[in-house]
């Protein structure tokens, strides 16, 4: 079950970014954070969202070398959207179609490396949110998730 409390997603992202910045990535990547100012707090389980964001950044780092990983937070009426974008290897169409279903990986050691996109999907949908991705082989991946500003 989720433990929902008023949460500032911008502060949460700064906290996660600080953790990653203090441990240089093996891929020599630059981490960039872009946060839209003055967004309201939302009702969320911060621990679970940190788990999702950490997993998405770890995935991006694992598939990106000497590139850029961008984390952005934007708001639109009723929703806040976080995007973790990388300049890495990207995914094939088949991998992209199955990525949120919980049984596909570009990396045979995948399950040793975090919770997986399927669990991210479960956490976001439990918040009344939605998660989706865009990816092209050789051009990187963008994973988005949107959370409602009011409980659904």
Predicted segments with their positions:
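A conserved beta-strand-to-alpha-helix junction within the catalytic ATP-binding
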Residues: 3-18
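Conserved catalytic submotifs in the C-terminal HATPase_c
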Residues: 3-7, 30-40
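Short beta-strand/loop element within the Bergerat-fold HATPase_c
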Residues: 68-78
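Short conserved segment of the HATPase_c
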Residues: 91-103
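Short alpha-helical Gxxx[C/S/T] motif in the catalytic ATP-binding
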Residues: 116, 120
């Amino acid at each position: 079950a989720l433990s929902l409390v008023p949460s500032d997603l911008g502060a949460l992202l700064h906290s996660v970014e600080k953790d990653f910045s203090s441990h240089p990535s093996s891929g020599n990547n630059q981490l960039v954070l872009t946060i839209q100012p003055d967004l309201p707090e939302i009702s969320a389980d911060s621990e679970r969202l940190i788990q999702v964001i950490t997993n998405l950044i770890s995935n991006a780092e694992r598939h990106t070398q000497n590139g850029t990983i961008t984390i952005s937070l934007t708001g639109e009426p009723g929703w806040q959207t976080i995007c973790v974008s990388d300049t890495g290897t990207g995914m094939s169409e088949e991998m992209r179609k199955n990525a949120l279903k919980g049984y596909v990986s570009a990396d045979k050691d995948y399950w040793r490396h975090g919770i997986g996109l399927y669990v991210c999907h479960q956490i976001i949908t439990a918040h009344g949110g939605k998660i989706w991705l865009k990816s092209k082989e050789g051009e990187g991946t963008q994973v988005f998730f949107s959370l409602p500003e009011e409980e659904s």
